[in-house]
A protein has these predicted regions:
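Long, charged, low-complexity intrinsically disordered regions
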Residues: 237-238, 280
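Edge beta-strands of jelly-roll/beta-sandwich modules across compartments, strongly enriched
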Residues: 268-280
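Short proline/glycine-enriched turn/loop motifs at strand-loop junctions of beta-rich domains
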Residues: 208-209, 224-226
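Short loop segments at secondary-structure junctions
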Residues: 208, 235-236
Length: 280
């Protein structure tokens, strides 16, 4: 009935579309893979699971609270894989419903900003619970925190300096040059040359630019591929990252840089990027 009445609805936890991240604190994994063993989707609907045979396929039980559910080691013996992205669920308050005595215990904008960056910026979606009060309205402390959160997010992404740089990649296929990673189009993307499972992208500025954030996104119609990478500023490592997926937000201490280098150090096949943005 849900599919019939709300065909675009996303079913979570006990549903087949997105999976619970495994906690209600707003945390997600260091490497949040969207491709996971199909048994995880069944585990979401089943309270208890029994081991069926003593072999590689059944020797490890998978559930949403496991730290590693998508690495090569985990999926190697899976009978079937599914696209099952993570959703981070948490509340702006200590609980899921409104209680007036909690008006002084609302999560701050700084806390919510960190949750946003750690979830949305790590290949997960974010479902933030904001309970209405007994009059059906959002309480004033919640509104104030949310308004400040919006301002903080806008500030982080206010100054995009990507267009100020000349961009190059060590390799690319002819149909998908590196310029397609920075053209702002959702359906164009860069892909490394065939056979490449690592690559380096270089952005060179004509004059020093203060940089503190890099946003990456893969071309998901061709799959989630990137496993790890590094960001270097004028020869010094500024940040490391694991999976990219829909979006990876890499924040680091502000640095004045002439040459910014993004090294994809491991990928399951030729890496792709549909999104590459650099912010002050």
């Amino acid at each position: 009935m849900l599919r019939k009445l709300q065909p675009n609805a996303v079913l979570n936890v006990c549903g087949p579309d997105v999976r619970w991240c495994g906690n209600e604190a707003g945390h997600c994994r260091k490497a949040e893979w969207s491709v996971v063993p199909a048994e995880l989707r069944d585990a979401e609907r089943t309270a208890s699971k029994s081991q069926q045979a003593d072999d590689g396929e059944f020797s490890r039980k998978i559930d949403s609270q496991d730290e590693d559910i998508g690495s090569r080691e985990v999926i190697r013996n899976a009978r079937e894989l599914v696209w099952y992205p993570s959703e981070v669920d948490t509340s702006i308050r200590t609980g899921w419903f409104y209680h007036p005595e909690e008006d002084t215990d609302v999560r701050t904008a700084d806390e919510l900003r960190d949750i946003y960056l750690d979830a949305v910026g790590a290949n997960a979606s974010l479902l933030l619970n904001i309970p209405p009060d007994t009059h059906g309205r959002i309480a004033a402390p919640d509104c104030a925190s949310l308004a400040e959160l919006g301002a903080k997010i806008r500030q982080i992404f206010a100054s995009n300096v990507t267009e100020k740089a000349a961009i190059a990649a060590d390799s690319a296929i002819a149909q998908h040059p590196i310029t397609q990673a920075v053209d702002g189009m959702a359906d164009t993307y860069w892909q490394a040359a065939y056979g490449q499972e690592s690559d380096t992208i270089t952005l060179k500025f004509q004059k020093p630019q203060k940089v503190s954030c890099v946003v990456l996104g893969e071309h998901l119609p061709t799959g989630q591929r990137i496993e790890s990478g590094e960001i270097w500023a004028d020869g010094s490592k500024a940040s490391e990252f694991t999976v990219v997926g829909h979006k990876r937000i890499c924040r680091f201490a502000p640095v004045d840089v002439l040459t910014l280098t993004i090294k994809i150090t491991a990928s399951r096949t030729e890496p792709t990027l549909r999104l590459l943005e650099v912010y002050q």
